[in-house]
Amino acid sequence: MTEAAKPPTIPELEAQERRLTLPHFTYDDAWAFGNLLVELARRRCAPVAVDIRRGGQQLFHAALPGSTPDNDAWIDRKRRVVERYGSSSYLVGCRFRAKGTTFEESSRLDPDKYAAHGGAFPITVEGAGVVGTVVVSGLPQVEDHALVVEALEQFMTRPWSSS
C-alpha cells in the first residue's frame, strides 16, 4: 500500500470478506496459500510472521527475516479477535473506532489476549462459514491486512481441484 492510498472503509472491508470465500480449505490448500503469502512477503522484504489455522489446528507457520517472537504474540492476539467476532481483526477495530471508542476501551476483553489490529482474516468456506484464520504480523496494521487480502485474491484465481 502506498502512502497516498487510503485505508479501506468499513463497507469495503465487509465486501472483502463476502468476496473472499473459498470452495474448500484442505491441508494442501493451507500449504499452497501459506507459500504464496510467504512469497509475496519475501518480494517486499517484509519482516513478517505468517500463521494459518483451521479450527484449533495450526496448518502453516513461517517467520521471515526481521520478524521477532513478538510477532507470534501479536498473531495470537489478532487471531483470537477473528475467532470471537468472525470478522477480520482490522474490520473489528474499525467498527469500534466508528463508534467513537476503541476495542481496548469497549470490548471488555483482555488486551493481553485480544488485539483488533489489522492482519488477521477469516478463512471462509462456501456453505460452511468461517473455518479458520490467516494472520500476518510485522508491518503496520493496514499493510498486514492488505498483504493477507492480496494473497487471498491471488490464491482464489488458481484452478480449484477436488482435493
UniProtKB/Swiss-Prot annotation:
A Pfam family:
HbpS-like
The protein's matches in InterPro entries, at most eight in alphabetical order, are given as: PduO/GlcC-like, PduO/GlcC-like_sf, YBR137W-like
Disulphide bonds annotated for this chain are none
Protein name, as recorded: UPF0303 protein SAV_5210
Family, per the entry? Belongs to the UPF0303 family.
In terms of SUPFAM superfamilies, this protein maps to:
GlcG-like
